[in-house]
Amino acid sequence: MTNIRKTHPLMKIVNNAFIDLPTPPNISSWWNFGSLLGTCLILQILTGLFLAMHYTSDTMTAFSSVAHICRDVNYGWIIRYMHANGASMFFICLFMHVGRGLYYGSYTFLETWNIGVILLFATMATAFMGYVLPWGQMSFWGATVITNLLSAIPYIGTNLVEWIWGGFSVDKATLTRFFAFHFILPFIITALAMVHLLFLHETGSNNPTGIPSDTDKIPFHPYYTIKDILGAMLLILVLMLLVLFTPDLLGDPDNYTPANPLNTPPHIKPEWYFLFAYAILRSIPNKLGGVLALILSILILVLVPFLHTSKQRSMMFRPISQCMFWVLVADLLTLTWIGGQPVEHPYIIIGQLASIMYFLTILVMMPAASTIENNLLKW
């Protein structure tokens, strides 16, 4: 008799994705971040659902409803901080996951990679709208500044901004629609993640060497199920250390002041995971130019597969490319630091140089390094 997990229409899907899936025997812990992102997504949807039960999306009561969650709702404080810091863990995993893809050449799976880029955009949009909901000073001014960037679009810009706002400023209509979008987007992200997996399972996973491993694949269960569970436990451990010891470490103190349209905070800045993009935005002294650079800083990932000039897939045996990769990582850390600094000398020039370096590394230096390596290997 055949096993039910191999014949039942629903269980067959689960079986082929998580149990009998042929997996490379040598994938490292860098391949854990996909499952960790799934864990984060489930955690965010669950904590978000319970927060939504007590939150009110009205400008008069939004701030106090969040305070009410923290003070009066049973374990409301832990749900709120798990959700806020869960977003930070989500982005740490996202950046690691994208970095892994860049390093080991996983971007050659075009459909999987491009859906991943769409997922990154969707997650950033969700996080931005979620940050607006507590209706603190940084929520309000962050929403005002970022939505205002759309006014840089020629001809339709101003109308577009007012349409998104639902009025002539960020107000009740804006907050209500942001709450609606923030609620629906994670489910769209879940659907996209399933498509992401679907395309990945068409080709099978890459591995650190970048060499096809079809000859010696192993079943996903029990080897990688246990590995993923260990990863998830470590993720939850780090998250709970943040939540229980320093819940406000990654937040902005300004967001504990209720939103006031008449009082602008001295330094408007987004959450830490957007600072690199914010630094690129600010480094260009032209509004439209800044907006384009901001979008291109993420959209450039779509070009990466077409800039791959190496004869090898992975960077594992390519020291010059490795050097370029770590230059890019250092540059992104520099941009993150600059994004949180005031707009004054010397930060302006450092930000501009780091922004140029970012695009130069991806568009010129990495493909050049690959070509040099090909020549050194006489390929």
UniProtKB/Swiss-Prot annotation:
Look up the record and report any one GO term of the cellular component aspect: mitochondrial inner membrane
Q: How does it sit in the membrane?
A: Multi-pass membrane protein
Cofactor(s) the protein requires to work: heme b
InterPro entries, alphabetized = Cyt_b/b6_C, Cyt_b/b6_C_sf, Cyt_b/b6_N, Cytb/b6-like_sf, Cytochrome_b, Cytochrome_b_C_euk/bac, Cytochrome_b_N_euk/bac, Di-haem_cyt_TM
Query: Record-annotated residues binding a ubiquinone?
Result: H201
Q: Where is the signal peptide?
A: none
GO biological process, alphabetically ordered: mitochondrial electron transport, ubiquinol to cytochrome c
What protein family is recorded? Belongs to the cytochrome b family.
* Additional free-text comment from the UniProt record: Heme 1 (or BL or b562) is low-potential and absorbs at about 562 nm, and heme 2 (or BH or b566) is high-potential and absorbs at about 566 nm.
Q: What is this protein called?
A: Cytochrome b
